[in-house]
């Protein structure tokens, strides 16, 4: 027997038992985004490698350690590790944002070469939102309100908390970076090799270290909020006022900086304690310089991304008894000469008249007992049975499979009316 081939480590299959929950979560995401007037876009999963190096930053962990990159003839390509850079590239290329506001969303797989663990995978999925051309803090607030509404729709609002910060302008961060490096230079004995490298290349990333001893020292470090430029300070104050007025609870976290270099001003994360160490379910912020950095006209930007694997895990964790719609409403059971055509005709009539119903035709042969076992396996609600006697009398047997043992025989002409009453 030939050796079987397994999925790549950290890249997972989604089974039929799992996909209904994924579909339900994704449907809620789409519905909430539509209710705010956002439009879907779709981008390639492969982009030119320099796009991510320029957008995310060459000294970030994502670009320096985690990207899947390969050569195609003389061009270096990368499986996208996140969605913002590709969305900005597409917006510039196709003129979506030239003198124009846009509120966009996308959903799909991303790829990072990380150590796989619960809630962190090498292929993972994100729902991302990007808004272009709006400078004021009202749009920052709208994105946070949008995510809060999604948590309510999913029944997880009590298990997520909002962390908020402002990282100011590029100049403000440069001043803060210098002060932070001066402070940390006296504590290098507490750092491992990776943290020492970050101190040189990207010192703000040390603020979210998992090193407990270093975290204790950072409590006395200079605070980024103290170095904000006046415009960023006012922007952040107005955002906080809006959130207060709308009843959104949040914690100002002065150590929150996000892991990508393109952010400025507002940054935020929705976090949970229900998933262990992988507690960030949604993160985002402003990137007002990114469009120009990638060759477009100066255009303000703000957005967020939701990790769908973590979102699905959280829904499972806090709603252990939730019941999702079954995959099949009606199962067509038929046996005997000439019953196949009639079963197919009836199935298509139901689909035409009641398109919301999920109708499965058996197709596999066998006796009635075998077919009913299959109907039970797919958890169908109702079986419709056609045998030679039903064919001769133009009747059909309707049998309840879930909530009762009811079984009735009705005229085929009355079937659609009967199903309309039951569904």
UniProtKB/Swiss-Prot annotation:
The keyword ATP-binding applies. One of its GO terms (biological process) is histidyl-tRNA aminoacylation. CDD domains: HisRS-like_core (cd00773), HisRS_anticodon (cd00859). It comes from Haemophilus ducreyi (strain 35000HP / ATCC 700724). Homodimer. The gene is hisS. Pfam families: HGTP_anticodon, tRNA-synt_His. PROSITE patterns: AA_TRNA_LIGASE_II. This is Histidine--tRNA ligase. The lineage of its organism: Bacteria, Pseudomonadati, Pseudomonadota, Gammaproteobacteria, Pasteurellales. Belongs to the class-II aminoacyl-tRNA synthetase family. PANTHER family: HISTIDINE--TRNA LIGASE, MITOCHONDRIAL-RELATED (PTHR43707:SF1), HISTIDYL-TRNA SYNTHETASE (PTHR43707). The keyword Aminoacyl-tRNA synthetase applies. GO terms for molecular function: ATP binding; histidine-tRNA ligase activity.
């Amino acid at each position: 027997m030939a050796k079987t081939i397994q999925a790549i480590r950290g890249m997972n299959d989604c089974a039929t038992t799992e996909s209904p929950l994924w579909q339900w979560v994704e449907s809620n995401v789409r519905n909430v985004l539509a209710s705010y007037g956002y439009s879907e876009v779709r981008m390639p999963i492969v982009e030119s490698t320099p796009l991510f190096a320029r957008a995310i930053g060459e000294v970030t962990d994502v670009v320096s350690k985690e990207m899947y990159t390969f050569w195609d003839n003389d061009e270096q390509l990368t499986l996208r590790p996140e969605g913002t850079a590709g969305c900005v590239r597409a917006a510039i290329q196709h003129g979506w944002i030239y003198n124009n506001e846009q509120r966009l969303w996308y959903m799909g797989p991303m790829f990072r070469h990380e150590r796989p663990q619960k809630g962190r995978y090498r292929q993972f999925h994100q729902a991302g939102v990007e808004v272009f051309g709006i400078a004021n803090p009202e749009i920052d607030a709208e994105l946070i309100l949008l995510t809060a509404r999604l948590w309510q729709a999913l029944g997880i609002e009590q298990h997520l908390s909002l962390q908020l910060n402002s990282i100011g302008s590029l100049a403000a961060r440069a001043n803060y970076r210098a002060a932070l490096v001066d402070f940390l230079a006296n504590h290098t004995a507490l750092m491992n090799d990776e943290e020492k490298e970050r101190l040189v290349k990207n010192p703000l990333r040390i603020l979210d270290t998992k090193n407990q001893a270093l975290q204790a020292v950072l409590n006395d470090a200079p605070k980024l909020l103290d170095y904000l430029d006046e415009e960023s300070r006012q922007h952040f104050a107005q955002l906080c006022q809006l959130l207060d007025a709308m009843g959104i609870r949040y914690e100002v976290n002065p150590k929150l900086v996000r892991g990508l270099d393109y952010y400025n001003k507002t940054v935020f994360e929705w976090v949970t304690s229900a998933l262990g160490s992988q507690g960030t379910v949604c993160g985002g912020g402003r990137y007002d310089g990114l469009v120009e950095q990638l060759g477009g006209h100066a255009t303000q930007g703000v957005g967020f991304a939701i990790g769908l694997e973590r979102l699905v895990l959280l829904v499972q964790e806090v709603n252990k008894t939730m019941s999702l719609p079954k995959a099949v409403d009606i199962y067509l059971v038929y046996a005997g000469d000439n019953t196949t055509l009639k079963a197919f005709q009836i199935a298509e009539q139901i689909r035409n008249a009641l398109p919301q119903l999920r109708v499965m035709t058996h197709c596999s042969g066998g006796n009635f007992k075998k077919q009913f076992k299959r109907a039970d396996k797919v958890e169908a609600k109702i079986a419709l049975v056609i045998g030679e006697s039903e064919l001769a009398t133009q009747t059909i047997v309707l049998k309840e499979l879930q909530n009762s043992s009811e079984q009735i025989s009705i005229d085929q002409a009355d079937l659609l009316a009967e199903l309309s009453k039951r569904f």
